Amino acid sequence: MKPLSLLIEILIILGVTIKTIKAEEHNKRQKERNVTTQVSVNEIKQYLSHILEQRTSSNVINKRENLLEKKKNQRKIRIKGIQNKDILKRNKNHLQKQAEKNFTDEGDQLFKMGIKVLQQSKSQKQKEEAYLLFAKAADMGNLKAMEKMADALLFGNFGVQNITAAIQLYESLAKEGSCKAQNALGFLSSYGIGMEYDQAKALIYYTFGSAGGNMMSQMILGYRYLSGINVLQNCEVALSYYKKVADYIADTFEKSEGVPVEKVRLTERPENLSSNSEILDWDIYQYYKFLAERGDVQIQVSLGQLHLIGRKGLDQDYYKALHYFLKAAKAGSANAMAFIGKMYLEGNAAVPQNNATAFKYFSMAASKGNAIGLHGLGLLYFHGKGVPLNYAEALKYFQKAAEKGWPDAQFQLGFMYYSGSGIWKDYKLAFKYFYLASQSGQPLAIYYLAKMYATGTGVVRSCRTAVELYKGVCELGHWAEKFLTAYFAYKDGDIDSSLVQYALLAEMGYEVAQSNSAFILESKKANILEKEKMYPMALLLWNRAAIQGNAFARVKIGDYHYYGYGTKKDYQTAATHYSIAANKYHNAQAMFNLAYMYEHGLGITKDIHLARRLYDMAAQTSPDAHIPVLFAVMKLETTHLLRDILFFNFTTRWNWLKLDNTIGPHWDLFVIGLIVPGLILLLRNHHG
């Protein structure tokens, strides 16, 4: 495995060396941007041979020194002229084991240092330093470091994306039993990225990955069995896979509050991603900071919350969060007081864990009727932190906070009734409060609802409902952080890196990632797949997103069949998908497309009246459809009128007047050309 880790070191060196050359080809506004670098096999071999020669000569010298040392020890370990071979052998084994232990310990230390640097990194340069530490640890045989390096090469985490090198490293790791490597190889096989497209092989890799405890593999298999992707659809099997992951996620949420991740849809604002509402624009953030420093209490609390959990693309920063909360609390904000209490209750880098201080701030907020403060006091009494354990007091505060609509308090009430903590068990009330909290996205409430549906506790058992709920919990795992890195990679123009990350999330069953992957593939800007494979793969992903309820994806499937993208032209199938999007999701674009097909009899029986009705429905559904519908209806009415005038009782006698023959099959475009100038003149006269 050492040659592979050496290869990684070489890639890093080459990536840093030629970074500036490649950066000039990118957008001038992006400074010091890392780019994907492909290193030729010959260059790699040359560097490898050079380093290996140095190491070989070094090994020869070491062997000679060891031999001399061995002879010296042999002379010492003699009893009355007879060599004690047993003592020598034991000594040799001990020294060898000690050397191996020291070597392993050093690799572990380097890996831990790399993790620490990576967690604290604020710039690309610092991240590269972390991966250099991982490379050194990998060279010492640290499997976790090798996994990190393989991921970095696959996703382009430190500026160099080399899928071929990543695959080589994953294959070596898989032989060592790495379930993470097996999951990665399954993913690459399922898309045909750098490997042969092979769904059967992908399924085998995922199965081995899942057996080894890899939660991504378990999620992927859960989604496949839920949807029947290359396996027989089986809800119970899907339930077993999703439950394993959901149990882990719920356990982490019980210990500490998770950080929600914004899932930006590339399909919504492809022309102006920087203004996407899911990510806070830097200029807007600076403006908010200005307002906060000027004393805007509401903005102070909002910025404090964003920094407390790291939302809208901002880094989690406890010091900044505390700074804004203290300012707002000084101005009398009950929310700010409650959040300060929460920080002291949990403890973090900015404040030490202190139950007494938490109680103080929660009490201040609760005295103002604040739901977060009331819930905080309930938690202190429920767990007996800083106050005597008192379930009755906890119940009282949770009820007050729940009445004000605080979802965490609603969950706590549900949990008390579910577990019988200080009160009689009541599954109906537990279900009621879990359901209320779940409507606000409270993750633990969703988890316990899934548990109740899976076991039939307090409700009629429903495997499908349980799986859907467990799936929602699983999608809150730390792997969802790739949504942000994928988005920023796309925004920076690193399409291949973005696609690989979205594609992995899509494989795990995230609908947003499926849509985003299909959107990128459709643009044909990626280089990691052959161009002829992009439309078929995009169609597959649009279909998976549509099955999960995405109306835009359903319209896209109709478009692909209408135009023959990635499949044969099929007007009938296109009309079917447009009809589903129009009737089930009330999608204006689908209504418009379906109306056009009825107007021209494409794949369905021609029906002018139904076409007119669908055009009207599209206009009523979406204001954006008003102008297109206006032109479409004017064209429809005009052509219909012209046909009545020109062809009524004159078809045989005046055959030469047929518009299809005189102007051509696209004569309706000619008619539109006549209508538009007339409409413009009418509008001018009207305003004049």
Swiss-Prot record:
It is found in: Membrane; Cell projection, Cilium; Nucleus speckle. GO terms for biological process: ERAD pathway. Glycans are attached at N34. Residues 684-688 are cytoplasmic. Residues 24-662 are extracellular. Pfam families: Sel1. The keyword Transmembrane applies. InterPro entries: Sel1-like, Sel1_AlgK, TPR-like_helical_dom_sf. Keywords: Cell projection, Glycoprotein, Membrane, Nucleus, Repeat, Signal, Transmembrane, Transmembrane helix. The keyword Transmembrane applies. The chain crosses the membrane at residues 663-683. Gene3D superfamilies: Tetratricopeptide repeat domain. It is a single-pass type I membrane protein. Residues 1-23 form the signal peptide. Sel1-like repeats lie at residues 107-142, 143-178, 179-214, 215-250, 297-333, 334-370, 371-406, 407-442, 443-478, 551-586, 588-623. Its main location: membrane. Belongs to the sel-1 family. This is Protein sel-1 homolog 2. It comes from Homo sapiens.
